[in-house]
């Protein structure tokens, strides 16, 4: 796949690449398919970052994920918390892959004098989101549960977890 990515970048000569690509999913998908989340996300980042470098792309912006920070990080999360504790087990493979992308940008910057960066968006949701109960993220799953419960006149909704995590969300 790197050849296709490299050829696309070579042919189109972008000044900036913003990497929003990734294999994503909810708790169930992350638990059941950790190798796919790890391998596919590392491949996406490696292919894009390496091809950007080889084709002299000046600006590369990588989207990270808040899940790269330790499970027990204090709120609000600070960049300095990275790699200071254990990751959440339910999405550890995805988190490790996103850490690899962040570190790749740092290493390309130091070794090759690039200015690649990683930004951490909050949880995004909106039109065309994934509402599959086995693969969706927290907010689309919650929205679907509310709608389904309303249809069936149910008075309660099951939400996984302890209720303690804090999340930032943005409608897109």
Annotated model-derived regions:
Residues 1-41:
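NAD(P)H-binding glycine-rich loop region in Rossmannoid oxidoreductase-like domains
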Residues 4, 43, 47-51, 104, ...:
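Conserved mid-core alpha-helix of short-chain dehydrogenase/reductase
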Residues 14, 34-46, 50-53, 57, ...:
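Catalytic Tyr-X3-Lys loop
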Residues 19, 46-91, 117:
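Conserved Rossmann-fold NAD(P)-dependent oxidoreductase catalytic core, especially the SDR/UDP-sugar
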Residues 22, 65, 121-124:
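Active-site loop/turn elements of alpha/beta-hydrolase fold enzymes
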Residues 72-81, 103-172:
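NAD(P)-dependent short-chain dehydrogenase/reductase
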Residues 93, 97-100:
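Active-site helix of classical SDR
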């Amino acid at each position: 796949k790197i050849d296709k990515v490299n050829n696309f970048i070579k042919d189109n000569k972008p000044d900036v690449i913003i990497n929003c690509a990734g294999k994503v999913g909810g708790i169930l998908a992350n638990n059941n398919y950790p190798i796919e989340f790890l391998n596919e996300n590392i491949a996406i980042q490696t292919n894009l970052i390496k091809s950007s470098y080889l084709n002299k792309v000046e600006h590369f912006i990588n989207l990270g994920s808040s899940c790269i920070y330790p499970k027990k990080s204090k709120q609000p999360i600070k960049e300095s918390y990275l790699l200071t504790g254990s990751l959440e087990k339910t999405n550890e493979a995805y988190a490790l892959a996103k850490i690899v992308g962040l570190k790749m940008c740092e290493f390309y910057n130091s070794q090759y004098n690039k200015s690649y960066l990683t930004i951490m968006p909050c949880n995004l949701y909106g039109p065309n989101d994934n509402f599959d109960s086995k693969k969706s993220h927290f907010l689309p799953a919650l929205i679907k549960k509310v709608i389904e419960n309303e249809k069936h006149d149910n008075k309660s909704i099951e939400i996984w977890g302890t209720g303690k995590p804090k999340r930032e969300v943005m409608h897109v």
